[in-house]
């Protein structure tokens, strides 16, 4: 991994962006075991994709993430207390306690929330890209999907329309080998998603999804091309899901050997080791960055835990008045 192509400031920024969702998730897993959150869909081991993609985009370009893309939310610098409040069902959260997962978005940070079907976001991204193209705004739109999401019919519809209308949209496929517990080889026979994209007339690349520098540089190049000359791209990010579909489901259906192989490719450890090896950071600086992020997370958690719980009366503004005549 040659990091010398990127400025030191960029490398340090990517490092902090990588660490934040990892340390955030580790805290969430502790809270889950303590019963302070109800569920969690882990993206541990896949952070480089969310981080590299988000860092390469302009802040006013829309992103359609999924349930493992915490790095998109932290990468857009959403205050951590608001994210914790969302996942703990507090009033400060984006859904004000009415939902405790990733089913939320925010126009302020140009993020469109997902729904569990993991297909419709692709077509909606086409719509945003079409609006940008018609208004000549020179912006790109990014939509995430995965092995399972690509088996949805909307994957076909979205890619076909994007190709025919030459929309400035980039489809990110997190190819982690599984959809829930179904191996990819039981869903499709293509050797890679590049083959699928080419069938629609879409240019595509397959990259190491655990290499944040490669993800970042690839997205810089493709997003710049899409802004200058509207066209769609597909980026297959090869990675692996290091935990269960969600924490309650377990991982017994995945061979242990795969975990051992991919643990050696951990995106944080490999990037961190390269930064140290090439003299970009020292051990002391590394520890200082870790401590700073952990403190920020701890402060946010303590603030949100001290908030009052949602009470039923707070929901009434979403319903009809009880004394209304029908």
What label would you give each PLM region?
Residues 26, 30-165, 183-189, 194, ...:
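Cofactor-binding active-site loop characterized by glycine-rich and histidine/acidic residues
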Residues 111-299, 303-306:
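Glycine-rich ThDP/TPP pyrophosphate-binding loop and its adjacent helix/strand module
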Residues 316-322:
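Conserved small/polar residues in nucleotide/adenosyl-binding loops
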Residues 312-314:
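Acidic, proline/serine/threonine- and glycine-rich low-complexity intrinsically disordered segments
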């Amino acid at each position: 991994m040659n990091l010398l192509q990127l400025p030191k400031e960029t490398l340090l920024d990517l490092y902090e962006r990588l660490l934040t969702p990892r340390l955030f998730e580790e805290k969430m897993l502790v809270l889950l075991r303590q019963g302070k959150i109800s569920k969690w869909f882990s993206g541990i081991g896949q952070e480089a994709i969310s981080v590299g993609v988000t860092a390469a985009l302009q802040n006013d370009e829309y992103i359609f993430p999924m349930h493992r893309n915490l790095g998109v939310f932290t990468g857009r610098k959403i205050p951590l207390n608001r994210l914790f409040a969302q996942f703990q069902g507090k009033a400060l959260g984006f859904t004000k306690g009415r939902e405790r997962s990733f089913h939320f978005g925010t126009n302020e940070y140009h993020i469109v929330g997902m729904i569990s079907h993991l297909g419709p976001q692709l077509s909606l991204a086409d719509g945003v890209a079409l609006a940008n193209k018609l208004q000549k705004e020179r912006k790109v739109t990014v939509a995430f999907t995965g092995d399972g999401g690509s088996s949805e019919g909307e994957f076909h519809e979205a890619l076909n329309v994007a190709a025919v209308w030459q929309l400035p949209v980039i489809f990110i496929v997190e190819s982690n080998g599984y959809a829930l517990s179904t191996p990819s080889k039981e869903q499709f026979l293509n050797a890679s998603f590049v083959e699928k994209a080419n069938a629609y007339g879409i240019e595509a690349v397959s990259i190491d999804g655990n290499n944040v520098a490669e993800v970042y540089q690839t997205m810089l190049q493709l997003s710049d091309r899409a802004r200058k000359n509207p066209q769609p791209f597909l980026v297959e990010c090869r990675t692996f899901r290091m935990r269960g579909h969600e924490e309650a489901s377990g991982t017994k259906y995945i061979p242990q050997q795969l975990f051992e192989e991919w643990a050696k490719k951990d995106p944080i450890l490999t990037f961190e080791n390269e930064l140290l090896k090439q003299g970009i950071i020292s051990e002391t600086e590394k520890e200082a960055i870790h401590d700073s992020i952990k403190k920020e997370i701890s402060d946010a958690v303590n603030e949100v835990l001290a908030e009052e719980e949602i009470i039923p009366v707070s929901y009434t503004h979403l319903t009809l008045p009880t004394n209304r005549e029908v």
